[in-house]
């Protein structure tokens, strides 16, 4: 832990905490200050002027990033339809299960996957296990495209690399835009798409400054402030 702490302190010295960096410079600095031995994730964090207790100020969804997110995502599809089971397997789903198999997986706590995609008919069953799936971030939701009559298409999009976004109770949105191994231009394109999406989704009831703060960081690196246009 002491070694990690020392590396983080060294990385922080490269960042002026009072400076707001242009987006491309912030991306380059996030990569430079990543000291992890693995291929670190690069994340954006928005602090938004939202009161998420109000239904018209809740923000949640997903977008397809132009260069993917660099992450290998294991997808489980839940459907009783033989046709959808077949097409989902062909689309690249890692696991395809029916109603009974789904319940068995949840009961046995065998969560060897990152995302559940369900056809709408499976939701009554999944709803019973909301307290188990919710905290793990596995509960399917129509807003993120994981509850759909076309799970095969959802699998293709997820495998390409989607960015999920959701404002927490403080109005903070964290979202993955890629990996350290990706080029600066790829991360820049992905970041621009996400930023434009968040801007476009500003609720009409919000007055004043919408994006209060925007930062970027690697998995184990310091936060870097981004200059907003």
From Swiss-Prot:
Entry superkingdom: Bacteria
Biological-process GO terms, alphabetical: regulation of translation; translation
Record's GO cellular component terms: large ribosomal subunit
Molecular functions (GO terms): rRNA binding; structural constituent of ribosome; tRNA binding
Lyase keyword on record: no
InterPro entries the record matches: Ribosom_uL1_bac-type, Ribosomal_uL1, Ribosomal_uL1-like, Ribosomal_uL1/biogenesis, Ribosomal_uL1_3-a/b-sand, Ribosomal_uL1_CS
Keyword Transmembrane helix carried by entry: no
Keywords: Repressor, Ribonucleoprotein, Ribosomal protein, RNA-binding, rRNA-binding, Translation regulation, tRNA-binding
Pfam assignment, any one: Ribosomal_L1
Biological role stated in the UniProt entry: Binds directly to 23S rRNA. The L1 stalk is quite mobile in the ribosome, and is involved in E site tRNA release.
Family label: Belongs to the universal ribosomal protein uL1 family.
Protein name: Large ribosomal subunit protein uL1
Annotated source species: Mycoplasmopsis pulmonis (strain UAB CTIP) (Mycoplasma pulmonis)
Taxonomic lineage of the native organism: Bacteria, Bacillati, Mycoplasmatota, Mycoplasmoidales, Metamycoplasmataceae
């Amino acid at each position: 832990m002491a070694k990690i702490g020392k590396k983080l302190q060294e990385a922080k010295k490269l960042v002026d905490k009072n400076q707001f960096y242009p987006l491309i410079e912030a991306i380059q600095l996030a990569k430079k200050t990543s000291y992890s031995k693995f291929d670190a994730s690069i994340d954006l964090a928005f602090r938004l002027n939202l009161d998420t207790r109000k239904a018209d100020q809740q923000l949640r969804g997903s977008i397809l990033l132009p260069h993917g997110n660099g992450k290998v995502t294991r997808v489980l599809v839940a459907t009783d339809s033989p046709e959808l089971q077949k097409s989902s397997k062909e689309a690249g789903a890692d696991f395809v299960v029916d109603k009974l198999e789904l319940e068995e997986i949840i009961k046995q706590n065998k969560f060897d996957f990152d995302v559940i995609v369900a056809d709408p008919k499976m939701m009554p069953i999944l709803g019973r296990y909301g307290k188990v799936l919710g905290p793990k971030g596995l509960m399917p939701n129509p807003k993120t495209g994981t509850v759909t009559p076309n799970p095969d298409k959802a699998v293709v999009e997820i495998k390409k690399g989607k960015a999920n976004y959701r404002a927490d109770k403080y109005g903070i949105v964290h979202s993955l835009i890629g990996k350290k191994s990706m080029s600066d231009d790829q991360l820049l394109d992905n970041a621009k798409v996400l930023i434009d999406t968040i801007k476009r989704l500003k609720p009409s009831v919000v007055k004043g400054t919408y994006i209060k703060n925007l930062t970027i960081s690697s998995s184990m690196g310091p936060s870097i402030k981004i200059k907003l246009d």
